[in-house]
Each structure stands twice: as C-alpha cells, then as structure tokens.
C-alpha cells in the first residue's frame, strides 16, 4: 500500500522557498491538495506549496519548517527526492543570502555557478 511520506527540511520562509522553486523551473502552486490515487483510501493531504499533483511542501507548525510531502513509492520526478531537496536547499540559500545582502545596502554584481555546482556571489556597496 502506498502512502504519503514527509521529509524534514530546514526551510522556514515561504516567500524564499517559492522564489527558489521558481528559479529551478518547477511548477508551483499554493494551498492545494495532493491526492494519492493508489490504494482504496485515495489519501489526500493539504499543502502550502505544491509542485504538480504528487509533490508538496507543508509547514510543520511545531518546528516552523516546511516539510516535503510525497509518495516515495510512486515518485515520478526524474530527480531523486534527496537530490531534489539538495537543489531546492541550495537555491533557497542563494535567495536568502541575496535578500540579506540587499538589506545591508549591497548589490549583487555577479552570480556564477561553477562546474562543481558551487555558487559564487560577488556583492558591492558604495560608501
């Protein structure tokens, strides 16, 4: 029998998470229900952010972190779940850093992704 699983993350800010998902080119929707048609119960779960019909993020009210919600047995995405979380977390960190840099009066001059997938940001500020 198939069922929804949750994978913990340390992603806390919805707006930053949305930007990261959009940057990755993922189909984003908000406040939608995921439905698992496998089995007889047709399990449903409400998510704050959904990526299509089978992957979502739901806020854990206790930890204040968003958790990835999906059915791991019927995973259809070409990227494995753990790798997807790594990519999303990296983009989330870039978006969060960019926001904080701008708050302090800096401008991002360049952003470069190296062959090893590390990201290099160069920020400047006039004094």
Located regions from the model:
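Interaction-mediating elements
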Residues: 1-127
